[in-house]
């Protein structure tokens, strides 16, 4: 049981670190979109969409795992809160990345 709790704690910690990196990537991608609007580069558009796709895939994977974990009967209040918090953070990031992808796809390239 202690092993499982430690595993959950480490998993949440690692996911929070990845979400923080995704937030930084989102800011960087927003700057790249500004550059894309000026340059109309097909290569830059493809690169931005690839990076967004990787972020969305990570969030979707984490979401599936955390939703399964929340069904466990042995979770204490703190563990449940941590999983729900990670799901909420992931949902916000997913929404922002999806909106950015929509914006990028709408940009005409040369």
Swiss-Prot record:
Q: Which InterPro entries match?
A: Mite_allergen_group-5/21, Mite_allergen_group-5/21_sf
Q: Which Pfam family, an example, fits this chain? A: Blo-t-5
Q: Taxonomically, which superkingdom?
A: Eukaryota
| Keywords of this entry | Allergen
Give the family this protein belongs to, as stated in its UniProt record.
Belongs to the mite group 5 allergen family.
Q: What is this protein called?
A: Mite allergen Lep d 5
């Amino acid at each position: 049981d202690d092993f499982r709790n430690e595993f959950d704690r480490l998993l949440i910690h690692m996911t929070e670190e990845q979400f923080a990196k995704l937030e930084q990537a989102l800011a960087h991608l927003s700057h790249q979109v500004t550059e894309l609007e000026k340059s109309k580069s097909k290569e830059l558009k493809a690169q931005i969409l690839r990076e967004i796709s990787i972020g969305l895939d990570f969030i979707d994977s984490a979401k599936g795992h955390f939703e399964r974990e929340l069904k466990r009967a042995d979770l204490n209040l703190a563990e449940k809160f941590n999983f729900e918090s990670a799901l909420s953070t992931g949902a916000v990031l997913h929404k922002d990345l999806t909106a950015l992808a929509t914006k990028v796809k709408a940009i005409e390239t040369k």
